Structure formats: structure tokens, C-alpha cells
Amino acid sequence: LLFGKSRIGAVMEQHYQNLIDETAEYLEGSELTRKRLNEDDRSMRIQSDYIWQYSRYPVHENTTAEYFQVGDDMFPVLVHELEQAKHFIFIEYFIINDGVMWQTILNILEKKAKEGVDVRLIYDGFGCLTTLPYKYDQEMRRRGIKCEVFNRFRPILNIIQNNRDHRKICVIDGWTGFTGGINLADEYINQRKRFGHWKDTAVMLKGEGVWNMTAMFLYMWGIVTRTDTSLDFGNYVPHRWHPNDFPGSGYVQPFCDSPLDDEIVGENVYLNIINRARNYVYICTPYLIIDNEMMTALCLAAKSGVDVRIMTPGIPDKKMVFLLTQSY
């Protein structure tokens, strides 16, 4: 049995809260945007306000979004955008594995670092435990890339080992951002066949909404380096390097959840979406392990006439998880 809260967790939580307090002004968002959202869709304003209050990330306008239904479509666009970088590149991923995808990206990162671009990389210590060499972060630094490992894996019994960084974020110059389910490994772009044709999705944002993703990275950078990154925030806002207006209609609100508080923002957002659905709920997920509250919401939506469909892989990458998924 493990009792109490780890001291490491307490220190991390306090440091994170200090960063939040010191940078609150950068995440106030636009009251005019919130007012327009309220006029366009009161229900969405309520959802947006919840996200803002409990994840601290505001809603934005002036942002375009492009959806990629497989990694094969996303990868060439990512490469193109990386090659255009002039000021900074922030990359944060759970899994990085050597191969066509990573070597292509790494070559660009090295080139950009030599050009004076601020290139930073965060990868998860457990996610990359068997895919990257030991002390790979030191190799990255030798190549001019600022690199940190999130929660480096240590073979000891410690509850903190369960805290993992599953994010997939790439931010370029503050106004171009990629996220989704695609890690930096060849199977995600179907250059390597592991479990049939690999389907994971991604989204590219361009515009003011990318600021939320930049802030997420800077907060994490402050945590893994145990430094004060609050002074960095003003240097990376979207309009610092892009003085012109951004195109785009509608609203975007990238956000993240945190293990350092008791508010399950991610699940609550999904529950709100499902409970407010009127026509359909379509879910595509590699793993389906849900609690009673989520199951009740999905079943109630279906019983109320909403078209509820869930698609999961037919070829599993984790057999135990696959069995649990089938049980639902």
C-alpha cells in the first residue's frame, strides 16, 4: 500500500500553481469573444466557461482548423510547417521512436537550431523507455536542441511513476499547432506495419487559438526544468511574430487536464457534449474503458433517440485493453 501524497508531487503542484498565478494575465482571453459566443450559442458559451474556469484556457476566434484522418496525411504537412519555422519550435510527445518519421523531423530540428531557432523537446520517460537510447536527452542537447524528459522512469515502487505525459503537441512560431493521437513513430504514418493499417487522427490549428497550446508547453517546460518560465510567456504570444490578423471563423478552445487537482475536466467536457447531443454521437477511439457515469450518458443518449456509434480497432495493440473494450 502507498499512503499519502508524494513529496515530489507536492513540490510539483506548488511550482505549477506558482506558474499559473504568475501568468494568469496571459490567459484571460477576450471578453468580446465570449460575448459573441454567447450570442451565437448560449449552450456552447456555458461549456466554454466551464473549460476556462477549471482548465484556465480561454476560447479564441481568428483560428483555422484542418483535420487529418490518418497520420499519412498529416506528416507531409507537419514537415512543411517545420521547415517554415523562423523563431521557435516546441515539441512534446509521449512516444518517439527512431525511423523515417523521427529522422525526418530530427534533421529539420537540427537545421533550425543551427539557424538560431529556439527548438525545445519534451518526451515521456516511460513512453520512450524502449524506443530511445538511455540519456537521449543529452544527445539532443549536443545537437543544439533543448531537451527534457518528463518523469524519467526509475525501477522503484513509486506512485509517481503512474503520472505520464500523453500529450502530442507541436507548436511552430506561436501560430501553427498540431495535436491529436499521432506519436512520432513510423507505425503512425504507416511506414511500419504492426497491427494492420494504423489509424490515428490529428488537427492543425493556425491562428490565435494556438496560444493555449504554447502555454501548455511552457507550463510543462517549467515543471520539468523546475524553473520559472513565467517571463517567457510574453515572448511567445501569437502576434509577437505575426503582426497581421489571422483568418478563420468560429471558435476554438484547446485545453488540457491536470493530475494535480480533483477536477476531471476532460471527462466532464465529454459528458457535457453527450448530454447535449440532439442528433448523433460518433466516437472513434483506440481504447474504450469507461466508468458508470460515461456509460449511463451514452446509453441515455441512445435511449433518447440520439444516433450513438462507437468504433474501436479490430486488431489490438494491447490485448488486455482489447478484452476490456469488448466487454462493453
Protein language model features and the residues they cover:
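Active-site metal-binding loops of divalent metal-dependent hydrolases
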Residues: 182, 286-287
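Helical hairpin unit composed of two closely spaced alpha helices linked by a short loop
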Residues: 287-308, 313-318
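Internal, well-ordered alpha-helical scaffold/interface segments
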Residues: 275, 296-299, 326-327
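N-terminal localization/anchoring segments of enzymes in phospholipid and broader phosphate metabolism
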Residues: 1-268, 272, 276, 300-303, ...
